[in-house]
Amino acid sequence: MAIQTSNLGYPRIGLQREWKKTLEAFWSNKIDEEQFLTTMKEIRLQHVKVQQEKGIELIPIGDFTYYDHVLDTAYMLGFIPSRFSEFTSYLDVYFAMARGSKDHVASEMTKWFNTNYHYIVPEYEEGLQISLKDNRPLRLYEEAKQELGVDGKPVILGPYTFLKLAKGYTQEQFPTILKQLVAPYVQLLSELHTAGAPAIQVDEPIFASLTKKEVQQAKEIYEAIRKEVPNATLLLQTYFDSVEENYEEIITFPVSGIGLDFIHGKEGNLNAISKYGFPADKTLAVGCIDGRNIWRADLDEVLELFTTLQKQVQTKDIIVQPSCSLLHTPIDKTEETHLSTELFDALAFANQKLEELVLIHSALTQGTESISNELETYRNVHHTIRSSAARNREDVKAARTALKEEDFSRPLPFEKRYELQQVALELPLLPTTTIGSFPQTTEVRQTRKEWRNGVISNEQYEQFIEKETEKWIRYQEEIGLDVLVHGEFERTDMVEYFGERLAGFSFTKNGWVQSYGSRCVKPPVIYGDVAFINGMTIKETVYAQSLTEKVVKGMLTGPVTILNWSFVRNDIPRKEVSYQIALALRHEIELLESSGIRVIQVDEPALREGMPLKEKDWDAYITWAVQSFLLATSSVANETQIHTHMCYSNFEDIVDAIRALDADVISIETSRSHGEFIDTLKHTTYEKGIGLGVYDIHSPRVPSKDEMYTIVEQSLEVCDPKYFWINPDCGLKTRRTEEVIPALEHMVQAAKDARSLLKTNA
């Protein structure tokens, strides 16, 4: 039996975020297309070279992208919306789809399964001619072969997952469009096989959550493809969960090998193998290293997994690989020497995970004695972090034990609270507000950098933050917004900011991962018990409120979002970590309220993305996620208005959960998803305060008043005007001042027009 190492995908952004910087330089016309393509090629080949040097045998090719791999697939197959037909060059079309243009909105963006990565949603239009417009995987395969001598493994998004992620068709049209994908996929795979690709990885993550009927549909497509490409080595790759429910059928697919996730789907996949075995004529690709977290593997546990598999599986070949693409992890931990030894030793970023794969390969091919020293080191590291004081705080344990049922609910029901809040806040019909952040200009970022580097004093930095806050309070007053925000100029990131001020968190210097496009985030590391230390937002919020007679919102990030946007310790359940964060935020909210802040927003944009892929597992997650929010927010007075915010989610799955949060007002991304949530509300009622975002903040274009008014009009068909708010989709941190001010002016004017119409109709 042959055993090989493989990787499913490598982080794109570069060790020093060279990828991000190159993209943004190109977008701002600081480099031309030739320089852009040259630099991107250098980065792409460097990533292949690193994996080669680490000893990976099946190196992924084609996982690299200029923006998003789903967008790459859409372009490759001709899924190009007609509104972009005026563009002729590849890059102009590609980036217009991703980012929009002066005259046209971008394609929708949403979360990649239950991760914090965002993909561009493919759009199907009537009359679309589906064909292989560009065999990009072939070009990149040949490039790696010619430039580096690497006979790589092309990676493509599978036809079933691709079409399931697309929009614009009816369910009745789905089977027909799916069949139309056969020809371009046959051409793609045939050309790769002819070029000599030793194996082709076909990603089908959606297989973890298909119905029996859908699996049969998918099988028919693979049979049609295999009939035309009989000799290509196709590796069907699943990840993010088990395929237990459909395993018996999936192992009969006409493919050469099947990749299973034994981290996030370990129990289900092992159960399925135990029950149905594994085909002797197929390769089993074992996802045994966590591709979504940053902790060293438990090598003993991984080797035990292989012992179990080898007793049950008589396959011809085994592949040792991560559970999913390493896109979701930072690149290398070697620069994180500022961390404590116990934490640094416990980490494994992408490059360290590749080394772990090679260690496991050595143990499997040469015996565990060949890595005996490494095994001993790993055992010591795990023991040290498990027994650390940071993970065993008695005060945190006591606070958790003391929780009572009444800690999870507000004293009065929403309707009665809202009446009291209307009296206390004196807001107009259809109040306007923003989501929280204002532009982080070059000056803001530079001043923060100077402060962090000791170039300016704490006092100078605080004066600068106050100056920016006052400037934007005045802007908001002039624009005519009803509920103001302080602008969050002191915050780099909505999760990092709180993590820096809570016990149990640590921070990397270079632990960046891609969120969407060129936007990278540096998730905090929750390594210990989380606890409140001191006030985190009081000073800035109270200062902003002192500048105006209007209401200023306090702005916090919610417990579930902090959890889902962090790298989380894996020694206790996520629910327990979430409750720890909620208790710390509860303390902060009480301080804001006692300081005179009457509206407090607790953002939960990541609530939906944390949901398990399988519907049977949703209830358990939603229960503790909602309870975490309630634990954080339920101790305030009835007159204090609790807001929350969500974005980029499939909200129809969680309308009941949104209702259960019992927030007085929720603001939701609407315009980027082209009104999808408005459609959801046509089939259900939402009887609490709600603001449906009226413009997409991720595009540089300034929408007209009429565009926003149209969304308000559509929203009021499904929402009670008494409870309706008007706001942008998300925070405005990444936009420029000259984009934000006219957009908000248009938004306020749209609100005034809507109020006038309501009064006239009344």
From Swiss-Prot:
Keywords: Amino-acid biosynthesis, Metal-binding, Methionine biosynthesis, Methyltransferase, Repeat, Transferase, Zinc. It catalyses: 5-methyltetrahydropteroyltri-L-glutamate + L-homocysteine = tetrahydropteroyltri-L-glutamate + L-methionine. Its EC number is 2.1.1.14. One of its GO terms (biological process) is methylation. L-homocysteine binds at residues 435-437, 488, 603. It holds the Pfam family Meth_synt_2. One of its GO terms (molecular function) is zinc ion binding. 5-methyltetrahydropteroyltri-L-glutamate binds at residues 17-20, 111, 519-520, 565, 609. Zn(2+) binds at residues 645, 647, 669, 730. Catalyzes the transfer of a methyl group from 5-methyltetrahydrofolate to homocysteine resulting in methionine formation. NCBIfam families: met_syn_B12ind, PRK05222.1. This is 5-methyltetrahydropteroyltriglutamate--homocysteine methyltransferase.
